[in-house]
Design a protein with these regions (language model features):
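Patatin-like phospholipase
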Residues: 22-63, 71-395, 408
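Bacterial N-terminal signal peptides that target proteins for export
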Residues: 1-10
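Bacterial N-terminal signal peptides
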Residues: 9-18
Length: 410
């Protein structure tokens, strides 16, 4: 028995040393996925090529749409699954906060018949108050929940095996905020909060908007996060418009955001070194809002990666090494939990029973995600809330469904 045990131990030690040696020999690689709205779907094509070539990465940093792709990938979504889910999403509906008419309360139906959509206003302590964005992002946030299976428990950034960083901007002071821990879906939502379009996200004492304003191509964060010796950088930003095409309030606002973004992108590009790999997919005719062209953008990203295939292939490992890396970053998706308790939190003025009357989830039964999301939209349709979200908590071994309505400030 003892000689067999010693031989087995020696073999295991040999494999461990071989893996450690291989990891030590290859350079540490950071992946940088820039922001650009729908153009960011090009990142999917890059991930497909990295997967085919067996190129492992040690961390990923993303901004805006790059944060969405980075987060979904780190949470276990494969490039093929991402192409499928993002390509078939109803983006026009996701970027509309209006619930289906049948999900509106009687009060909200009457208001929708009497007033223009998006014309809400209210009175608060300081006077008249209006929404802080064209949309609250209600449906977008629920979509993020679906992507990363938040119904089985909210993924936390610090718990993901692959280190991931997301960039947001504090709209109060203009500072760059790097999100490395906390709720994955909240970080994705914060990094994508385009000013004026999506309402800022209040999170950890900050009011956060799109990270593209301060760091649309977070090269420095990738180097710092995992000590990357080489960064693979994908820039999908929208080019600036010629001056004669900048017209109207919306056009001027978009150009101002573009100018701020362009300045920080140039600063990031100036730090690239000879060993780094830079991709700029040909997305000239795909706009930041062209979400119906997700598949096409992914194909363009793939083409850009294929053009750099020899350089990317130099970072590849053998099949066994890649399998080890895949196991190391794999995310175990828990089974659908049985709910032991339903909580409603965050209410000050609205009665908790007003929320609970919409909830069909039974205590002791498995969580029914589709029904829950319909119920959440019905709660939102009452018209009293800026947003309504949910999370599944593990409270001393008990699965708690927490529903979190945020009452309107207007």
């Amino acid at each position: 028995m003892r000689p067999c045990f010693l031989r087995a131990a020696a073999a295991a030690l040999s494999c461990t040393l071989a893996f450690t040696s291989a990891a030590a020999e290859r350079p540490r690689v950071g992946l940088v996925l820039g922001g650009g709205g729908a153009r960011g779907a090009a990142h999917i094509g890059l991930l497909e090529v990295l997967e085919e070539l067996r190129v492992p990465v040690d961390c990923v940093a993303g901004t805006s749409m790059g944060a969405l792709v980075a987060g979904a990938w780190a949470a276990g979504l494969s490039p093929a699954q991402m192409r499928e889910q993002l390509g078939h999403a109803d983006w026009a509906d996701l970027f509309s906060d209006e619930p289906v008419y049948g999900e509106l309360s009687f009060r909200s139906k009457r208001l929708s018949q009497r007033f223009l959509p998006g014309s809400e206003a209210g009175v608060h302590a300081g006077g008249a108050v209006t929404p802080s964005g064209v949309m609250s992002g209600q449906k977008i946030k629920l979509f993020f929940n679906q992507l990363v299976r938040a119904d089985t428990g909210e993924p936390m950034l610090e718990q993901l095996p692959l280190p991931v960083s997301m960039i947001a901007t504090d709209i109060g002071n203009g500072e760059r905020v790097v999100l490395r821990d906390g709720s994955l879906t909240q970080a994705m939502r914060a990094s994508m909060s385009v000013p004026g379009l999506l309402a800022p996200l209040e999170y950890r004492g900050h009011k956060l908007v799109d990270g593209g304003l301060v760091d649309n191509l977070p090269v420095a964060e990738a180097r710092e996060r995992c000590g990357a010796e080489i960064v693979i950088v994908a820039n999908v930003g929208t080019p600036l418009l010629p001056a004669d095409q900048v017209t109207g309030l919306f056009g001027i606002s978009a150009q101002v955001i573009g100018l701020l973004t362009e300045q920080n992108v140039r600063a990031s590009l100036a730090t690239l070194q000879a060993r780094d790999i830079y991709l700029r997919p040909d997305l000239a005719d795909i706009g930041a809002s062209d979400f119906e062209r997700v598949a096409e953008a992914a194909d363009r990203g793939r083409a850009a990666a294929e053009a750099l295939r020899p350089r990317l292939a130099a970072l590849a490992v053998d099949a066994a090494g890649y399998a080890r890396w895949q196991r190391r970053i794999a995310v175990r998706v828990p089974d659908v939990p049985r709910i032991d308790e339903v909580r409603v939190s965050g209410l000050e003025h609205v009665s908790e029973e007003v929320v609970r009357r919409h909830l069909r989830q039974r205590v002791g039964a498995p969580l029914e995600r589709d029904a829950l999301e319909q119920d959440v939209l019905r709660i939102y349709g009452d018209g009293w809330y800026e947003s309504v979200d949910y999370e599944v908590l593990d409270d001393a071994g008990r699965h708690v469904l927490r529903v979190m309505p945020v009452e309107k400030s207007w």
